[in-house]
Design a protein with these regions (language model features):
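Core catalytic alpha/beta fold that binds nucleotide/phospho-ligands
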Residues: 2-257
C-alpha cells in the first residue's frame, strides 16, 4: 500500500497540478488529517464474489443480493471491507465494531464518540474516508466529452463558473463541483433535506452554506491519473493522506493490530 499527502494550501483542480509528497509510515489518529483509502474494482476477479459474500455482515449480504449486475454487487461488498480495513488501519477500530445509521440514514459507528467514516463508489473506484470529525466523500466517473450535463441541481454561481471555465474540460469541471456538493451533503449527514442548489462549492470555497456545522471545513478534489474519475472529500483537516489499497490486500485479510 502506498500513501500520498495533499496539503490544503496546494490543492488545485487537476491531479497533475497537485503537489504530492510521497511518504513512508506516518502518524495515524492525527486530528489534523483526513485519511482516504481507495481500491480499484479492476483488482478484484469475479471469482472473489463468494468469498466476499461469506465475509460480509448479514445486512451487507442482503443489500448486495439486491443488485442485478455482478460489478454493482462487488462494489457494495468491497465498500464494507474497505471501511473495516480503513478504520482498523487508521484508528485501530475492531473489525467487528457495530455500524448504525443516524436519523437521515448516514452510516456511523455505533460508538458515536469514535472516528467518523464515509463511503462512495462509482465506475472502477471504491473509496473510504476516515477522520476524527464528520467527513463526506464522493467519487464519480467523468462523463464522456459532450455528455456532461449541468442540471438544475447546480446553483446559479456554479452554472456561471462552468460556463466560463478555462482550466479544465467541462466534463471534469462539472464532476469536480458535483462531487464537492455530494461530499458536503454527506458531511452534513442530513440526507435529502438540503437542496443541492441552495449552496455553491467553487474552488474549494463554500458559498451560501446550507444548514449545519461549516466552520473550518475544507474541500479537496482531484482526478485519477487518466482523468477518468474525480474524487472529492469534505471535512476538517489540514492534509489528506491518500492510500491505494490492492484488491489482494483486502482479500488477504485486514491489517494487523
Amino acid at each position: 500500500m502506498t500513501s500520498l499527502v495533499i496539503h490544503a494550501e496546494v490543492t488545485c483542480h487537476l491531479l497533475h497540478e497537485l503537489v504530492y509528497l510521497l511518504i513512508g509510515p506516518h502518524k495515524r489518529e492525527d486530528q489534523k488529517l483526513i485519511y482516504i483509502s481507495r481500491v480499484s474494482l479492476d483488482t478484484f476477479p469475479k471469482s472473489a464474489l463468494p468469498q466476499l459474500m461469506e465475509r460480509a455482515s448479514p445486512e451487507r449480504r442482503d443489500r448486495a443480493r439486491r443488485y442485478v449486475r455482478i460489478d454493482d454487487c462487488l462494489r457494495c461488498l468491497i465498500a464494507d471491507e474497505l471501511r473495516a480495513y480503513s478504520l482498523k488501519l487508521d484508528y485501530k477500530v475492531p473489525v467487528q465494531s457495530e455500524v448504525s445509521k443516524n436519523a437521515f440514514g448516514k452510516p456511523l459507528l455505533a460508538n458515536r464518540d469514535g472516528p467518523k467514516f464515509n463511503l462512495s463508489h462509482d465506475g472502477k473506484w471504491i473509496v473510504c474516508a476516515t477522520s476524527p470529525h464528520p467527513v463526506g466523500v464522493d467519487v464519480e466517473a467523468v462523463a464522456e466529452p459532450g455528455l456532461a450535463v449541468v442540471s438544475n441541481d447546480f446553483s446559479v454561481e456554479e452554472v456561471e463558473a462552468l460556463r466560463t471555465t478555462a482550466t479544465a474540460p467541462l466534463s471534469i469541471a462539472r464532476a469536480m463541483i458535483w462531487t464537492r456538493k455530494e461530499a458536503y451533503l454527506k458531511y452534513l449527514g442530513l440526507g435529502l433535506t438540503v437542496q443541492l442548489d441552495s449552496f455553491s462549492v467553487i474552488d474549494q470555497t463554500l458559498l451560501s452554506p446550507a444548514e449545519g456545522m461549516t466552520d473550518g471545513i475544507q474541500f479537496y478534489s482531484w482526478c485519477d491519473a487518466d482523468n477518468s474519475h474525480v474524487i472529492s472529500v469534505c471535512g476538517h483537516g489540514e492534509e489528506v493522506v491518500i492510500s491505494c489499497v490492492s484488491g489482494q490486500e483486502l482479500l488477504d485479510g485486514l491489517p494487523p493490530s
